[in-house]
Amino acid sequence: MKKVEIFTDGACKGNPGPGGWGVLLRMGKHEKELSGGEPETTNNRMELRAAIEGLNALIEPCEVELYTDSKYVVDGITKWVHGWKKRGWVNASKKPVRNDDLWHDLIEAELRHKVTWHWVKGHNGHAENERADRLASEAADLQS
């Protein structure tokens, strides 16, 4: 399996409001940047979308180190999702899971790969996270 690093971020101008997502893919010396946005969304949806788009950009199954500054994404995919599935997609408070459409997409995107999830502190000088943040912010600006 090829080894790939993915750095993701989401941004929103207002929450909800215009939003964007950014991804930096790295395999060895090769890098690719991806971004996109939506006119009316939330920060959490853009964080999820960034991870989904990053994983879906990989043509073949890969060993992935995915870095995000979103504890929501990391905790959701590594901890909470198991309980949500058991409870029929309701949270511990018996309320429907928010963004369940994107959680389903993320689970599907993750299946093909061996993914290790990493949380990094945002806006803390992590060069690749800063690049993903810039891509997400630029994409959000294009939506407003």
UniProtKB/Swiss-Prot annotation:
Molecular function GO labels: magnesium ion binding; nucleic acid binding; RNA-DNA hybrid ribonuclease activity
The catalytic activity of this protein is classed by the Enzyme Commission as: 3.1.26.4
Q: What highest taxon heads this organism's lineage?
A: Bacteria
Return the cofactor note field: Binds 1 Mg(2+) ion per subunit. May bind a second metal ion at a regulatory site, or after substrate binding.
Q: Which InterPro entries match?
A: RNase_H, RNaseH-like_sf, RNaseH_domain, RNaseH_sf, RNaseHI
Disulphide bonds in the chain: none
* Pfam families, sorted: RNase_H
Instruction: Identify which top EC class this enzyme belongs to.
Output: hydrolase
- Per UniProt, Mg(2+) 1 binds at D9, E47, D69
Protein residues bound to Mg(2+) 2: D9, D133
Q: How does it assemble?
A: Monomer.
**Annotated family:** Belongs to the RNase H family.
Protein task: Endonuclease that specifically degrades the RNA of RNA-DNA hybrids.
Q: What is this protein called?
A: Ribonuclease H
